[in-house]
Amino acid sequence: MAAKEVVFGNDARVKMLAGVNILANAVKVTLGPKGRNVVLDKSFGSPLITKDGVSVAKEIELEDKFENMGAQMVKEVASKANDAAGDGTTTATVLAQAIVTEGLKAVAAGMNPMDLKRGIDKAVAAAVIELKNLSQDCADSKAIAQVGTISANSDESIGQIIATAMEKVGKEGVITVEEGQALENELDVVEGMQFDRGYLSPYFINKPETGSVELDHPFVLLVDKKISNIRELLPILEGLAKTGKPLLIVAEDVEGEALATLVVNNMRGIVKVAAVKAPGFGDRRKAMLQDVAILTGGTVIAEEIGLELEKATLEDLGTAKRVVITKDNTTIIDGNGEQAQIEARVSQIKQQIEESTSDYDKEKLQERMAKLAGGVAVIKVGAATEVEMKEKKARVEDALHATRAAVEEGVVPGGGVALVRVASKIADVEVANEDQKHGVVIALRAMEAPLRQIATNAGEEASVVANTVKNGSGNYGYNAGNDTYGDMLEMGILDPTKVTRSALQFAASIAGLMITTEAMVAELPKADAPDMGGMGGMGGMGGMM
Protein backbone atom coordinates (compact mmCIF):
# COMPACT_ATOMS: atom_id res chain seq x y z
CA MET A 1 0.00 0.00 0.00
CA ALA A 2 1.34 3.42 -0.99
CA ALA A 3 2.29 5.95 1.69
CA LYS A 4 -0.38 8.54 2.54
CA GLU A 5 -0.27 12.20 3.39
CA VAL A 6 -2.57 13.41 6.18
CA VAL A 7 -3.52 17.04 6.85
CA PHE A 8 -5.50 18.23 9.86
CA GLY A 9 -7.75 21.02 11.06
CA ASN A 10 -7.51 24.42 9.45
CA ASP A 11 -4.87 23.33 6.90
CA ALA A 12 -7.26 20.64 5.61
CA ARG A 13 -10.23 23.01 5.47
CA VAL A 14 -8.28 25.75 3.64
CA LYS A 15 -7.17 23.27 0.95
CA MET A 16 -10.67 21.87 0.60
CA LEU A 17 -12.19 25.36 0.30
CA ALA A 18 -9.65 26.27 -2.40
CA GLY A 19 -10.84 23.29 -4.48
CA VAL A 20 -14.51 24.17 -3.88
CA ASN A 21 -13.87 27.75 -5.03
CA ILE A 22 -12.01 26.79 -8.22
CA LEU A 23 -14.85 24.52 -9.35
CA ALA A 24 -17.71 26.77 -8.18
CA ASN A 25 -16.18 29.92 -9.72
CA ALA A 26 -15.92 28.17 -13.10
CA VAL A 27 -19.52 26.96 -12.87
CA LYS A 28 -21.23 30.08 -11.50
CA VAL A 29 -20.29 32.35 -14.42
CA THR A 30 -23.03 30.49 -16.36
CA LEU A 31 -25.91 31.46 -14.00
CA GLY A 32 -28.79 33.66 -15.14
CA PRO A 33 -29.88 35.22 -18.44
CA LYS A 34 -26.62 37.16 -18.72
CA GLY A 35 -24.40 34.28 -17.60
CA ARG A 36 -21.43 33.54 -19.87
CA ASN A 37 -20.37 30.35 -21.61
CA VAL A 38 -17.49 28.06 -20.67
CA VAL A 39 -15.31 26.37 -23.32
CA LEU A 40 -14.30 22.77 -22.58
CA ASP A 41 -11.34 21.19 -24.35
CA LYS A 42 -12.08 17.72 -25.75
CA SER A 43 -9.41 15.10 -26.45
CA PHE A 44 -10.93 14.62 -29.91
CA GLY A 45 -13.21 16.80 -32.01
CA SER A 46 -13.90 20.49 -31.58
CA PRO A 47 -14.09 22.12 -28.12
CA LEU A 48 -17.50 22.12 -26.43
CA ILE A 49 -19.10 25.46 -25.57
CA THR A 50 -21.64 25.12 -22.77
CA LYS A 51 -23.73 27.04 -20.26
CA ASP A 52 -24.69 23.88 -18.39
CA GLY A 53 -23.27 23.80 -14.86
CA VAL A 54 -22.91 20.04 -14.53
CA SER A 55 -21.05 19.74 -17.86
CA VAL A 56 -18.47 22.26 -16.60
CA ALA A 57 -18.21 20.59 -13.18
CA LYS A 58 -17.62 17.14 -14.68
CA GLU A 59 -14.59 18.39 -16.64
CA ILE A 60 -12.72 19.74 -13.60
CA GLU A 61 -9.94 17.68 -12.06
CA LEU A 62 -7.28 19.41 -9.92
CA GLU A 63 -3.62 18.52 -9.50
CA ASP A 64 -3.48 19.01 -5.71
CA LYS A 65 -5.09 15.91 -4.12
CA PHE A 66 -6.67 17.82 -1.20
CA GLU A 67 -8.04 20.65 -3.33
CA ASN A 68 -9.37 18.02 -5.72
CA MET A 69 -11.31 16.35 -2.89
CA GLY A 70 -13.15 19.63 -2.26
CA ALA A 71 -13.87 20.05 -5.97
CA GLN A 72 -15.11 16.45 -6.33
CA MET A 73 -17.56 16.85 -3.45
CA VAL A 74 -19.13 19.92 -5.06
CA LYS A 75 -19.17 18.06 -8.39
CA GLU A 76 -21.30 15.46 -6.57
CA VAL A 77 -23.78 18.24 -5.64
CA ALA A 78 -24.17 19.23 -9.31
CA SER A 79 -24.49 15.59 -10.46
CA LYS A 80 -27.12 14.76 -7.83
CA ALA A 81 -29.19 17.84 -8.71
CA ASN A 82 -28.92 16.88 -12.37
CA ASP A 83 -30.03 13.27 -11.70
CA ALA A 84 -32.99 14.34 -9.55
CA ALA A 85 -34.42 17.22 -11.57
CA GLY A 86 -32.28 17.46 -14.73
CA ASP A 87 -31.58 21.15 -14.13
CA GLY A 88 -30.56 23.59 -11.38
CA THR A 89 -26.97 22.32 -11.28
CA THR A 90 -25.43 25.81 -11.25
CA THR A 91 -27.82 26.96 -8.50
CA ALA A 92 -26.88 23.89 -6.43
CA THR A 93 -23.16 24.64 -6.88
CA VAL A 94 -23.58 28.31 -5.88
CA LEU A 95 -25.56 27.28 -2.76
CA ALA A 96 -22.94 24.67 -1.78
CA GLN A 97 -20.09 27.17 -2.16
CA ALA A 98 -21.94 29.75 -0.04
CA ILE A 99 -22.68 27.25 2.76
CA VAL A 100 -19.10 25.89 2.81
CA THR A 101 -17.53 29.38 2.80
CA GLU A 102 -19.71 30.73 5.62
CA GLY A 103 -19.56 27.45 7.54
CA LEU A 104 -15.75 27.24 7.52
CA LYS A 105 -15.52 30.86 8.73
CA ALA A 106 -17.72 29.90 11.69
CA VAL A 107 -15.60 26.81 12.42
CA ALA A 108 -12.43 28.94 12.33
CA ALA A 109 -14.09 31.28 14.85
CA GLY A 110 -14.42 28.32 17.25
CA MET A 111 -18.02 27.18 16.75
CA ASN A 112 -18.98 23.51 16.94
CA PRO A 113 -19.15 22.04 13.40
CA MET A 114 -21.72 19.37 14.34
CA ASP A 115 -24.12 21.97 15.77
CA LEU A 116 -23.62 24.18 12.72
CA LYS A 117 -24.59 21.24 10.51
CA ARG A 118 -27.69 20.52 12.62
CA GLY A 119 -28.72 24.17 12.31
CA ILE A 120 -28.26 24.08 8.53
CA ASP A 121 -30.30 20.86 8.29
CA LYS A 122 -33.16 22.35 10.35
CA ALA A 123 -33.24 25.48 8.17
CA VAL A 124 -33.31 23.43 4.96
CA ALA A 125 -36.11 21.15 6.24
CA ALA A 126 -38.20 24.25 7.07
CA ALA A 127 -37.32 25.82 3.70
CA VAL A 128 -38.53 22.75 1.78
CA ILE A 129 -41.95 22.99 3.49
CA GLU A 130 -42.17 26.74 2.69
CA LEU A 131 -41.20 26.11 -0.95
CA LYS A 132 -44.13 23.68 -1.25
CA ASN A 133 -46.47 26.35 0.18
CA LEU A 134 -45.11 28.92 -2.28
CA SER A 135 -45.45 26.56 -5.25
CA GLN A 136 -48.17 26.98 -7.89
CA ASP A 137 -49.43 24.41 -10.40
CA CYS A 138 -47.93 24.53 -13.87
CA ALA A 139 -50.91 23.38 -15.88
CA ASP A 140 -51.27 25.51 -18.97
CA SER A 141 -49.17 25.55 -22.09
CA LYS A 142 -48.11 29.19 -21.55
CA ALA A 143 -46.52 28.43 -18.16
CA ILE A 144 -44.76 25.35 -19.60
CA ALA A 145 -43.35 27.49 -22.43
CA GLN A 146 -42.12 30.09 -19.91
CA VAL A 147 -40.33 27.48 -17.79
CA GLY A 148 -38.70 26.01 -20.91
CA THR A 149 -37.66 29.48 -22.11
CA ILE A 150 -35.99 30.40 -18.79
CA SER A 151 -34.17 27.06 -18.56
CA ALA A 152 -32.96 27.34 -22.18
CA ASN A 153 -31.27 30.67 -21.37
CA SER A 154 -34.21 32.87 -22.44
CA ASP A 155 -34.59 31.22 -25.86
CA GLU A 156 -38.34 31.52 -26.57
CA SER A 157 -38.30 29.22 -29.61
CA ILE A 158 -37.09 26.32 -27.41
CA GLY A 159 -39.74 27.00 -24.73
CA GLN A 160 -42.45 27.12 -27.38
CA ILE A 161 -41.44 23.91 -29.16
CA ILE A 162 -41.35 21.99 -25.83
CA ALA A 163 -44.80 23.33 -24.85
CA THR A 164 -46.19 22.25 -28.26
CA ALA A 165 -44.62 18.79 -27.89
CA MET A 166 -46.10 18.34 -24.39
CA GLU A 167 -49.51 19.46 -25.65
CA LYS A 168 -49.40 16.87 -28.45
CA VAL A 169 -48.18 13.81 -26.53
CA GLY A 170 -49.50 14.56 -23.04
CA LYS A 171 -47.58 14.75 -19.78
CA GLU A 172 -46.75 11.04 -19.77
CA GLY A 173 -45.62 11.04 -23.42
CA VAL A 174 -42.00 10.59 -24.41
CA ILE A 175 -40.17 13.59 -25.85
CA THR A 176 -36.71 12.91 -27.25
CA VAL A 177 -34.08 15.37 -28.49
CA GLU A 178 -32.03 14.63 -31.60
CA GLU A 179 -29.60 16.50 -33.81
CA GLY A 180 -31.47 17.81 -36.86
CA GLN A 181 -30.32 18.48 -40.42
CA ALA A 182 -31.78 21.97 -40.89
CA LEU A 183 -30.94 25.38 -39.41
CA GLU A 184 -34.26 25.65 -37.57
CA ASN A 185 -35.64 23.47 -34.75
CA GLU A 186 -38.25 20.95 -35.93
CA LEU A 187 -40.88 18.90 -34.12
CA ASP A 188 -41.99 15.43 -35.28
CA VAL A 189 -44.93 13.89 -33.47
CA VAL A 190 -45.97 10.25 -33.83
CA GLU A 191 -49.50 9.96 -32.50
CA GLY A 192 -50.82 6.54 -31.59
CA MET A 193 -48.68 3.46 -30.92
CA GLN A 194 -45.69 2.93 -33.18
CA PHE A 195 -43.31 -0.02 -33.12
CA ASP A 196 -40.30 -0.80 -35.29
CA ARG A 197 -41.58 -3.67 -37.40
CA GLY A 198 -42.62 -3.26 -41.05
CA TYR A 199 -44.77 -5.35 -43.44
CA LEU A 200 -43.70 -8.97 -44.00
CA SER A 201 -44.30 -8.79 -47.75
CA PRO A 202 -44.25 -5.83 -50.16
CA TYR A 203 -47.32 -7.39 -51.84
CA PHE A 204 -49.41 -6.05 -48.93
CA ILE A 205 -48.74 -2.43 -50.09
CA ASN A 206 -51.95 -0.64 -51.10
CA LYS A 207 -50.53 2.90 -51.37
CA PRO A 208 -47.79 2.55 -54.01
CA GLU A 209 -47.12 6.31 -54.09
CA THR A 210 -45.92 6.24 -50.45
CA GLY A 211 -44.84 2.58 -50.41
CA SER A 212 -47.04 1.91 -47.38
CA VAL A 213 -50.03 -0.14 -46.26
CA GLU A 214 -53.02 1.79 -44.92
CA LEU A 215 -55.93 -0.03 -43.30
CA ASP A 216 -59.09 1.87 -42.26
CA HIS A 217 -61.07 0.54 -39.27
CA PRO A 218 -59.21 -2.79 -39.28
CA PHE A 219 -59.52 -5.77 -36.95
CA VAL A 220 -56.23 -6.59 -35.16
CA LEU A 221 -55.23 -10.23 -34.56
CA LEU A 222 -52.47 -10.72 -31.95
CA VAL A 223 -50.71 -14.10 -31.84
CA ASP A 224 -47.76 -15.05 -29.62
CA LYS A 225 -46.34 -17.74 -31.94
CA LYS A 226 -45.27 -18.40 -35.52
CA ILE A 227 -48.04 -18.94 -38.08
CA SER A 228 -47.00 -21.22 -40.93
CA ASN A 229 -50.20 -23.21 -41.58
CA ILE A 230 -53.08 -21.34 -43.25
CA ARG A 231 -55.58 -23.83 -41.79
CA GLU A 232 -55.19 -22.13 -38.38
CA LEU A 233 -56.27 -18.79 -39.85
CA LEU A 234 -59.28 -20.01 -41.89
CA PRO A 235 -62.02 -19.50 -39.24
CA ILE A 236 -60.91 -15.88 -38.71
CA LEU A 237 -60.56 -15.16 -42.46
CA GLU A 238 -64.01 -16.61 -43.21
CA GLY A 239 -65.58 -14.46 -40.49
CA LEU A 240 -63.75 -11.40 -41.81
CA ALA A 241 -64.84 -11.94 -45.43
CA LYS A 242 -68.46 -11.52 -44.24
CA THR A 243 -67.75 -8.20 -42.49
CA GLY A 244 -65.70 -6.78 -45.38
CA LYS A 245 -63.26 -5.15 -42.93
CA PRO A 246 -59.44 -5.31 -43.26
CA LEU A 247 -57.21 -7.32 -40.90
CA LEU A 248 -53.81 -6.62 -39.33
CA ILE A 249 -51.97 -9.72 -38.08
CA VAL A 250 -49.27 -9.16 -35.43
CA ALA A 251 -47.46 -12.45 -34.73
CA GLU A 252 -44.01 -13.79 -33.85
CA ASP A 253 -43.74 -14.54 -37.58
CA VAL A 254 -45.94 -15.45 -40.55
CA GLU A 255 -44.17 -17.69 -43.05
CA GLY A 256 -44.45 -20.31 -45.78
CA GLU A 257 -47.88 -21.36 -46.94
CA ALA A 258 -49.70 -19.01 -44.54
CA LEU A 259 -47.91 -15.89 -45.84
CA ALA A 260 -48.32 -16.96 -49.50
CA THR A 261 -52.08 -17.55 -49.08
CA LEU A 262 -52.56 -14.18 -47.32
CA VAL A 263 -50.71 -12.40 -50.15
CA VAL A 264 -52.82 -14.12 -52.84
CA ASN A 265 -56.09 -13.34 -51.01
CA ASN A 266 -55.01 -9.72 -50.57
CA MET A 267 -54.05 -9.27 -54.23
CA ARG A 268 -57.34 -10.79 -55.44
CA GLY A 269 -59.26 -8.52 -53.10
CA ILE A 270 -60.97 -11.41 -51.26
CA VAL A 271 -59.70 -10.22 -47.84
CA LYS A 272 -57.80 -6.99 -47.25
CA VAL A 273 -54.97 -8.09 -44.96
CA ALA A 274 -51.44 -7.20 -43.81
CA ALA A 275 -49.05 -9.04 -41.48
CA VAL A 276 -46.17 -7.75 -39.32
CA LYS A 277 -43.84 -9.33 -36.79
CA ALA A 278 -44.48 -8.61 -33.12
CA PRO A 279 -42.14 -6.00 -31.59
CA GLY A 280 -39.42 -6.88 -29.07
CA PHE A 281 -38.03 -10.25 -28.00
CA GLY A 282 -38.78 -12.79 -25.25
CA ASP A 283 -40.66 -11.44 -22.25
CA ARG A 284 -40.61 -7.90 -23.64
CA ARG A 285 -42.46 -9.14 -26.75
CA LYS A 286 -45.16 -10.75 -24.60
CA ALA A 287 -45.56 -7.49 -22.66
CA MET A 288 -45.72 -5.37 -25.82
CA LEU A 289 -48.30 -7.67 -27.42
CA GLN A 290 -50.37 -7.28 -24.26
CA ASP A 291 -50.00 -3.46 -24.56
CA VAL A 292 -51.35 -3.60 -28.14
CA ALA A 293 -54.19 -5.87 -26.96
CA ILE A 294 -55.22 -3.39 -24.25
CA LEU A 295 -54.92 -0.46 -26.67
CA THR A 296 -57.13 -2.13 -29.30
CA GLY A 297 -59.48 -4.01 -26.97
CA GLY A 298 -58.40 -7.45 -28.21
CA THR A 299 -56.92 -10.62 -26.71
CA VAL A 300 -53.45 -12.08 -27.27
CA ILE A 301 -53.87 -15.63 -28.65
CA ALA A 302 -51.25 -17.59 -26.71
CA GLU A 303 -51.16 -21.33 -26.06
CA GLU A 304 -49.73 -20.81 -22.57
CA ILE A 305 -53.06 -19.29 -21.49
CA GLY A 306 -55.07 -22.00 -23.28
CA LEU A 307 -56.11 -20.06 -26.39
CA GLU A 308 -55.69 -21.66 -29.82
CA LEU A 309 -55.66 -19.77 -33.10
CA GLU A 310 -58.02 -22.25 -34.80
CA LYS A 311 -60.67 -21.62 -32.14
CA ALA A 312 -60.32 -17.82 -32.18
CA THR A 313 -63.37 -15.75 -33.16
CA LEU A 314 -63.92 -12.13 -34.16
CA GLU A 315 -64.64 -11.45 -30.46
CA ASP A 316 -60.93 -12.03 -29.72
CA LEU A 317 -59.79 -9.39 -32.21
CA GLY A 318 -58.96 -5.80 -31.36
CA THR A 319 -60.04 -2.85 -33.49
CA ALA A 320 -58.53 0.53 -34.37
CA LYS A 321 -59.48 3.58 -36.39
CA ARG A 322 -56.49 3.31 -38.70
CA VAL A 323 -53.22 1.43 -39.17
CA VAL A 324 -50.27 2.63 -41.28
CA ILE A 325 -47.42 0.20 -42.07
CA THR A 326 -44.18 1.19 -43.81
CA LYS A 327 -41.09 -0.86 -44.62
CA ASP A 328 -39.75 -0.26 -41.08
CA ASN A 329 -42.62 0.82 -38.81
CA THR A 330 -46.20 0.02 -37.86
CA THR A 331 -48.42 2.73 -36.36
CA ILE A 332 -51.79 1.94 -34.75
CA ILE A 333 -53.92 5.10 -34.48
CA ASP A 334 -56.90 5.41 -32.11
CA GLY A 335 -57.19 1.87 -30.77
CA ASN A 336 -60.66 1.07 -29.43
CA GLY A 337 -59.53 -0.28 -26.05
CA GLU A 338 -61.28 0.73 -22.83
CA GLN A 339 -59.83 3.90 -21.29
CA ALA A 340 -59.98 2.44 -17.76
CA GLN A 341 -57.90 -0.59 -18.81
CA ILE A 342 -55.36 1.60 -20.62
CA GLU A 343 -54.98 3.79 -17.51
CA ALA A 344 -54.57 0.71 -15.30
CA ARG A 345 -51.85 -0.61 -17.64
CA VAL A 346 -50.06 2.78 -17.61
CA SER A 347 -50.03 2.86 -13.79
CA GLN A 348 -48.76 -0.75 -13.73
CA ILE A 349 -45.85 0.23 -16.02
CA LYS A 350 -45.20 3.32 -13.85
CA GLN A 351 -44.84 1.01 -10.86
CA GLN A 352 -42.34 -1.16 -12.78
CA ILE A 353 -40.31 1.96 -13.68
CA GLU A 354 -40.06 2.89 -9.99
CA GLU A 355 -38.95 -0.62 -9.03
CA SER A 356 -36.48 -1.11 -11.91
CA THR A 357 -32.76 -0.62 -11.24
CA SER A 358 -31.59 -0.84 -14.87
CA ASP A 359 -31.46 2.39 -16.91
CA TYR A 360 -32.06 0.42 -20.12
CA ASP A 361 -35.17 -1.26 -18.70
CA LYS A 362 -36.44 2.08 -17.41
CA GLU A 363 -36.03 3.65 -20.84
CA LYS A 364 -37.90 0.79 -22.54
CA LEU A 365 -40.70 0.90 -19.95
CA GLN A 366 -40.94 4.68 -20.37
CA GLU A 367 -41.33 4.19 -24.14
CA ARG A 368 -44.06 1.59 -23.63
CA MET A 369 -45.90 3.91 -21.25
CA ALA A 370 -45.69 6.82 -23.69
CA LYS A 371 -47.03 4.72 -26.55
CA LEU A 372 -50.04 3.77 -24.46
CA ALA A 373 -50.59 7.20 -22.94
CA GLY A 374 -50.27 9.50 -25.90
CA GLY A 375 -47.43 9.23 -28.32
CA VAL A 376 -43.84 10.12 -28.99
CA ALA A 377 -42.46 13.53 -29.98
CA VAL A 378 -38.98 14.12 -31.40
CA ILE A 379 -37.44 17.60 -31.22
CA LYS A 380 -34.82 17.97 -33.94
CA VAL A 381 -32.37 20.69 -32.97
CA GLY A 382 -31.19 22.87 -35.85
CA ALA A 383 -27.92 24.85 -35.95
CA ALA A 384 -25.35 26.21 -38.39
CA THR A 385 -22.29 24.37 -37.02
CA GLU A 386 -21.58 21.25 -34.97
CA VAL A 387 -20.26 23.30 -32.03
CA GLU A 388 -23.48 25.35 -31.91
CA MET A 389 -25.54 22.18 -32.34
CA LYS A 390 -24.02 20.53 -29.24
CA GLU A 391 -24.48 23.67 -27.14
CA LYS A 392 -28.08 24.12 -28.28
CA LYS A 393 -28.96 20.43 -27.81
CA ALA A 394 -27.72 20.58 -24.20
CA ARG A 395 -29.93 23.63 -23.58
CA VAL A 396 -32.98 21.91 -25.11
CA GLU A 397 -32.39 18.84 -22.90
CA ASP A 398 -32.11 21.06 -19.79
CA ALA A 399 -35.29 22.90 -20.72
CA LEU A 400 -37.11 19.62 -21.26
CA HIS A 401 -36.07 18.32 -17.81
CA ALA A 402 -37.13 21.63 -16.24
CA THR A 403 -40.58 21.56 -17.82
CA ARG A 404 -41.12 17.95 -16.72
CA ALA A 405 -40.12 18.94 -13.16
CA ALA A 406 -42.50 21.93 -13.33
CA VAL A 407 -45.44 19.76 -14.38
CA GLU A 408 -44.60 17.32 -11.57
CA GLU A 409 -44.27 19.66 -8.56
CA GLY A 410 -45.35 23.10 -9.81
CA VAL A 411 -43.43 26.38 -10.13
CA VAL A 412 -42.11 29.17 -7.89
CA PRO A 413 -40.98 32.71 -8.82
CA GLY A 414 -37.61 32.50 -10.62
CA GLY A 415 -34.46 34.58 -10.55
CA GLY A 416 -33.49 33.40 -7.05
CA VAL A 417 -36.56 35.15 -5.54
CA ALA A 418 -38.21 31.98 -4.16
CA LEU A 419 -35.25 31.19 -1.88
CA VAL A 420 -35.07 34.82 -0.64
CA ARG A 421 -38.79 34.76 0.26
CA VAL A 422 -38.46 31.36 1.93
CA ALA A 423 -35.44 32.55 3.95
CA SER A 424 -37.43 35.48 5.41
CA LYS A 425 -40.15 33.09 6.62
CA ILE A 426 -37.92 30.56 8.41
CA ALA A 427 -35.58 32.90 10.31
CA ASP A 428 -37.12 31.93 13.66
CA VAL A 429 -36.85 28.14 13.28
CA GLU A 430 -36.43 26.40 16.68
CA VAL A 431 -32.87 25.41 17.65
CA ALA A 432 -31.15 23.98 20.74
CA ASN A 433 -28.20 26.39 21.14
CA GLU A 434 -26.33 29.41 19.75
CA ASP A 435 -24.14 27.39 17.37
CA GLN A 436 -27.22 25.78 15.80
CA LYS A 437 -28.73 29.27 15.52
CA HIS A 438 -25.65 30.33 13.57
CA GLY A 439 -26.09 27.24 11.35
CA VAL A 440 -29.56 28.54 10.47
CA VAL A 441 -28.07 31.99 9.70
CA ILE A 442 -25.49 30.35 7.38
CA ALA A 443 -28.29 28.60 5.45
CA LEU A 444 -30.33 31.84 5.22
CA ARG A 445 -27.33 33.78 3.88
CA ALA A 446 -26.61 31.02 1.36
CA MET A 447 -30.20 31.22 0.07
CA GLU A 448 -29.46 34.75 -1.18
CA ALA A 449 -26.38 33.56 -3.13
CA PRO A 450 -28.16 32.57 -6.40
CA LEU A 451 -29.88 36.00 -6.63
CA ARG A 452 -26.58 37.79 -5.90
CA GLN A 453 -24.76 35.72 -8.54
CA ILE A 454 -27.44 36.43 -11.18
CA ALA A 455 -27.04 40.16 -10.45
CA THR A 456 -23.21 39.96 -10.56
CA ASN A 457 -23.31 38.12 -13.90
CA ALA A 458 -25.60 40.88 -15.23
CA GLY A 459 -22.99 43.48 -14.24
CA GLU A 460 -25.02 44.90 -11.31
CA GLU A 461 -24.06 45.47 -7.68
CA ALA A 462 -25.21 42.27 -5.91
CA SER A 463 -25.90 43.89 -2.49
CA VAL A 464 -28.10 46.63 -3.99
CA VAL A 465 -30.18 44.10 -5.96
CA ALA A 466 -30.48 41.73 -2.97
CA ASN A 467 -31.67 44.53 -0.64
CA THR A 468 -34.20 45.84 -3.18
CA VAL A 469 -35.66 42.35 -3.63
CA LYS A 470 -35.70 41.68 0.14
CA ASN A 471 -37.60 44.93 0.74
CA GLY A 472 -40.27 43.81 -1.74
CA SER A 473 -42.78 41.04 -1.08
CA GLY A 474 -44.48 38.11 -2.81
CA ASN A 475 -43.27 37.54 -6.37
CA TYR A 476 -41.41 40.87 -6.59
CA GLY A 477 -37.91 40.29 -7.97
CA TYR A 478 -35.14 41.33 -10.34
CA ASN A 479 -35.32 40.53 -14.06
CA ALA A 480 -31.67 40.40 -15.13
CA GLY A 481 -32.71 39.91 -18.77
CA ASN A 482 -33.87 43.52 -19.14
CA ASP A 483 -32.59 45.03 -15.86
CA THR A 484 -36.01 45.75 -14.32
CA TYR A 485 -37.85 44.90 -11.09
CA GLY A 486 -41.39 43.54 -10.94
CA ASP A 487 -43.68 40.53 -10.47
CA MET A 488 -41.65 37.49 -11.61
CA LEU A 489 -44.72 35.39 -12.46
CA GLU A 490 -46.19 38.16 -14.63
CA MET A 491 -42.85 38.56 -16.41
CA GLY A 492 -42.84 34.80 -17.06
CA ILE A 493 -39.73 34.12 -14.96
CA LEU A 494 -40.52 30.79 -13.30
CA ASP A 495 -38.42 28.05 -11.76
CA PRO A 496 -39.70 24.50 -11.22
CA THR A 497 -40.22 23.88 -7.49
CA LYS A 498 -38.53 20.48 -7.81
CA VAL A 499 -35.37 22.04 -9.30
CA THR A 500 -35.08 24.67 -6.54
CA ARG A 501 -35.86 22.14 -3.80
CA SER A 502 -33.36 19.55 -5.09
CA ALA A 503 -30.61 22.16 -5.49
CA LEU A 504 -31.06 23.33 -1.89
CA GLN A 505 -31.29 19.84 -0.36
CA PHE A 506 -28.23 18.39 -2.15
CA ALA A 507 -26.12 21.52 -1.60
CA ALA A 508 -26.89 21.55 2.13
CA SER A 509 -26.36 17.80 2.49
CA ILE A 510 -22.84 17.74 1.05
CA ALA A 511 -21.73 21.21 2.19
CA GLY A 512 -22.86 20.37 5.75
CA LEU A 513 -20.62 17.30 5.74
CA MET A 514 -17.66 19.29 4.40
CA ILE A 515 -17.92 21.78 7.29
CA THR A 516 -17.53 18.90 9.78
CA THR A 517 -14.24 17.73 8.19
CA GLU A 518 -11.25 17.66 10.57
CA ALA A 519 -8.69 15.57 8.66
CA MET A 520 -7.98 14.63 5.03
CA VAL A 521 -6.01 11.65 3.75
CA ALA A 522 -4.53 11.29 0.26
CA GLU A 523 -1.78 9.33 -1.45
CA LEU A 524 1.63 10.97 -1.52
CA PRO A 525 2.58 12.06 -5.04
CA LYS A 526 5.10 9.60 -6.46
CA ALA A 527 8.60 10.96 -6.97
CA ASP A 528 9.60 10.82 -10.64
CA ALA A 529 12.11 8.06 -11.39
CA PRO A 530 15.48 9.37 -12.67
CA ASP A 531 15.97 9.34 -16.45
CA MET A 532 17.88 6.45 -17.98
CA GLY A 533 21.41 7.46 -18.91
CA GLY A 534 22.15 7.82 -22.63
CA MET A 535 23.64 4.75 -24.30
CA GLY A 536 27.28 4.93 -25.32
CA GLY A 537 27.92 5.49 -29.02
CA MET A 538 28.99 2.51 -31.14
CA GLY A 539 32.59 2.48 -32.32
CA GLY A 540 33.23 3.06 -36.03
CA MET A 541 33.31 -0.09 -38.12
CA GLY A 542 36.51 -1.01 -39.91
CA GLY A 543 36.62 -0.80 -43.72
CA MET A 544 35.09 -3.83 -45.41
CA MET A 545 37.03 -5.78 -48.01
UniProtKB/Swiss-Prot annotation:
Does the record carry Protease as a key word? no
Task: State the gene name recorded for this protein.
Answer: groEL
Could you provide one GO biological process annotation from this protein's UniProt record? protein refolding
**Protein name, as recorded:** Chaperonin GroEL
Q: Which organism is it from?
A: Shewanella sp. (strain ANA-3)
User: Which locations, inside or outside the cell, does it occupy?
Assistant: Cytoplasm
Top-rank lineage group of the source organism: Bacteria
Keyword list (alphabetical) reads: ATP-binding, Chaperone, Cytoplasm, Isomerase, Nucleotide-binding
Q: Which chain positions lie within coiled-coil regions?
A: none
Cellular component GO terms held in the UniProt record? cytoplasm
Q: Which transformation does this protein catalyse, written as a reaction?
A: ATP + H2O + a folded polypeptide = ADP + phosphate + an unfolded polypeptide
